[in-house]
Swiss-Prot record:
Keywords: DNA damage, DNA repair, DNA-binding, Glycosidase, Hydrolase, Lyase, Metal-binding, Multifunctional enzyme, Zinc, Zinc-finger. InterPro entries: DNA_glyclase/AP_lyase_DNA-bd (IPR015886), DNA_glyclase_Znf_dom_DNA_BS (IPR015887), Formamido-pyr_DNA_Glyclase (IPR020629), FPG_cat (IPR012319), MutM-like_N-ter (IPR035937), Ribosomal_uS13-like_H2TH (IPR010979), Znf_DNA_glyclase/AP_lyase (IPR000214), Znf_FPG/IleRS (IPR010663). DNA binds at residues 91, 110, 151. This is Formamidopyrimidine-DNA glycosylase. It comes from Stutzerimonas stutzeri (strain A1501) (Pseudomonas stutzeri). Monomer. SUPFAM superfamilies: Glucocorticoid receptor-like (DNA-binding domain), N-terminal domain of MutM-like DNA repair proteins, S13-like H2TH domain. GO terms for molecular function: 8-oxo-7,8-dihydroguanine DNA N-glycosylase activity; class I DNA-(apurinic or apyrimidinic site) endonuclease activity; damaged DNA binding; zinc ion binding.
Amino acid sequence: MPELPEVETTRRGIEPHLVGQRVSRVLVRDRRLRWPIPEDLDVRLSGQRIEAVERRAKYLLIRAESGTLIVHLGMSGSLRLVDAASPAAKHEHVDILLESGQALRYTDPRRFGAMLWSDEPLAHVLLASLGPEPLGEDFDGDRLYRLSRGRSMAVKPFIMDNAVVVGVGNIYASEALFAAGIDPRRPAGSISRARYLKLGEEIRRILAMAIERGGTTLRDFVGGDGKPGYFQQELFVYGRGGEFCKSCGSTLREIRLGQRASVYCSRCQR
């Protein structure tokens, strides 16, 4: 699933090609995403000038003159710029045609993504209750410490809760906990403030590094230019169960936490 760095990489890739452009047409080949694409999307977006391309959590907000297109990439979605005349392949469900002769093409093999229209996107039910951005000024380890008091749930699903902080998915939660030396199974309420301060720093550092590397390409993700990300080369634990720890050489363990695979080092993480 594309996580925050992959979505931000996509935003940075498509923004220069969209802002200031006018939409000439929206071609929808298949409306059946996680929620059906609005039947009037072509009417709403055609003729509109695109004013900004923003991100909130894992949602892309393509702001036009009279509203905003909310896009979620789901499990396997991607957005990239193509020549408007290029034929669509299987799973390429939507083209937003631009006056420049390019098209913003949405591909989603598993169709778990979304394209929705909103006049007030930040008040939309999908975005209104989200926590702070992990790279913003409202997030730090103190917030994690405060919200964790009295919580018995494991720390990994705690930091993956979008009400606590957005965009810390399975890949980056695993990597941040390893970097901070925290066992992902440890109860959130049992972790000291000092360790949470370290964890907050590692979340910010690792997400920033992943964005710089263009995200993590594990299966379907490509950036807005169609190129893969390279952060997978930096992974210490995610997807490496049974392999050796790059820090101490012991065997990494794989467990299930909150219905997700979690890999950790029993020697480095306490």
